Amino acid sequence: MREDLLRYLGLKDVLRAGWVRAGVVSPESVAAHSWGMAVLALKLCPPELDLLRVLQLCLVHDLPEVVVGDLTPHDDVSTKAEDERRAMGDLAPEWLHLLDEYTAQATAEAVFVKSLDKLDMGLQAMRYEHAQGMDLSEFLNSARNAVGEPFRGLLDDCEE
């Protein structure tokens, strides 16, 4: 149990690869991103969705990255899903069903969490642009293209 817990917390040390590639100073960790998604979920989760399930998906969707690392669309992602599934089976087999649900986008909760994933990226891009004077429009455009309403409007409102 002790070793498992320490491995999970290793996600705090895995930096978000997209921010590193973009040259962001002191980029967030994958764990910080998952926390950001969870906070957004608490604030934005529609009442018809199961909030506990949404939070579970937020917190474990990137857990395999403690083993496989954070991959971006610029990396070879041809085996990403199977590598992450294998890693989750090793790390926390009791949560493998959550990763499968998220990867397959099998429920309304999983679809919502995928939108939160992109929303968090877009909001974080705005934070970095403001704090570091960078052009991260690539990330903002990606987020806008990946989310539907009301999140697209929320991104627009936050950018103004």
Model-predicted segments: where are they?
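Active-site helical microenvironments for divalent-metal-assisted chemistry
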Residues: M1-E160
